[in-house]
A protein has these predicted regions:
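Carbohydrate transferase catalytic cores enriched for Leloir-type hexosyltransferases
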Residues: 1-367
């Protein structure tokens, strides 16, 4: 029996949730997650649907759910027994999250590390402490770990994980539509919460420079992402722009409208200082939209030759000049669009699922 641990899946839309919805449907294994009543359930793969779980009705379980501690509120051995299964039948446990099932340390487990951002660009001391003091236990319990980039793999090694236990499996994407053939205007899009690692001040510096030195820019930068620790700073920077009306702060958009905004934008921007992968950049490339991104290791790892890079901590002049070049030079826009689309074609979800399946199969054979 193979178990897929989904106890850390939170309600609503998130990057982690999107990862589950892309990957888990292609994997064999009984799904372990919270049911409508806030209790653990085991769902056969043929009966499972990739819908986010609800918030648990009880206050205690909802608290555990919020902090990815659900396993500590469940009697997992009893749940296994009530479903007619024995611990000895568990061949392997796979988690698309950075969580092992700590009650079963003797069962081979494969867990996924998407990033270690809380250790280097944390938004709270609580998150830093959780990663520094609690995540090492999950790493020790896991038999193997998936890192979604070589950058994350290197971070895991620095975190104390044996490099022989790490497998790098990058995110994949499905190309569902023909790429955009030409820019529809000069609008820009950034998908970023108001968190420290998203480095939104760099975008405001770039737009400020663009407005001052290229006043004919007629577009709008839309920053889509929920508020966070940096919201007061973001609001101050917004108001201080020469033309604040050219930047819109949007908490969220329905999926269809977000896609429409992306495809109608001249480019997607990402100024992050710390990421495990930065999936929105790949999403933009799958639509044929050029990307202008910060010069950080994980961006270089995947996007060298198919994106334009700007410093994360300069005065904004490089980003501004790149945007001017993109507006003026249609051939540059076309080059970035085509090279980005080619990168997206090379990173498929099917290949990602196949690599994960190999790792799960290897665990099953070792038990």
């Amino acid at each position: 029996m193979r178990l897929i641990n989904l106890l850390s899946w939170l309600p609503g839309h998130s990057g982690f949730g999107s990862y589950v919805q892309r990957v888990v449907p292609g994997l064999d294994g009984t799904r372990l997650q919270l049911g409508l009543d806030g209790q653990g359930v085991l769902v056969p793969s043929g009966q499972w649907t990739p819908d986010p779980p609800p918030w648990a009705p009880g206050r205690r379980m909802r608290f555990l759910q919020r902090y990815s501690l659900v396993q500590h509120g469940l009697d997992l051995p009893a749940l296994l027994h009530s479903n007619g299964a024995k611990l000895s039948q568990l061949e392997a446990i796979y988690s698309p999250f950075f969580d092992a099932l700590l009650c079963w340390p003797d069962v081979p487990q494969l867990i996924t590390c998407h990033d270690l951002t809380p250790l280097v660009a944390s938004n709270s001391r609580k998150a830093w402490l959780r990663y520094r003091l609690w995540q090492p236990r999950h790493c020790r319990t896991a038999t193997r770990l998936i890192a979604i980039s070589r950058y994350v793999a290197d971070q895991l090694v620095a975190f104390g994980v044996d490099p022989m236990c790490i497998e790098v499996i990058p995110n994949g994407i499905r190309i569902e539509r023909p790429g955009v053939q030409s820019p529809q205007g000069e609008d820009l899009l950034a998908l970023a919460r108001h968190d420290v690692n998203k480095n939104l001040p760099a975008l405001f510096r770039g737009i400020s420079q663009l407005q001052r030195h290229w006043p004919q820019w007629s577009g709008i930068l839309r920053i889509v992402g929920r508020s966070g620790r940096q919201t007061p700073l973001v609001q101050r920077l917004h108001k201080s722009l020469p033309r604040p009306e050219q930047v819109e702060l949007v908490d969220s958009l329905p999926r269809d409208l977000l896609l429409a905004r992306l495809r109608s934008s001249m480019a997607l921007l990402s100024a992050s200082t710390e990421e495990g992968f930065d999936y929105p950049v790949l999403e933009a490339k799958a639509e044929g939209i050029p990307t202008l991104i910060s010069d950080i290791p994980v961006h270089r790892e995947f996007h060298q030759g198919s994106s334009m890079f700007f410093p994360a901590h300069d005065d904004g002049s490089v980003l501004a000049s790149q945007l001017q070049a993109l507006i003026r030079d249609r051939s540059l826009w076309t080059h970035l669009s085509c090279s980005g689309l080619n990168l997206a074609r090379s990173l498929t979800v099917d290949a990602q699922i196949a690599e994960i399946s190999v790792q799960i199969n290897n665990l099953s054979k070792s038990c």
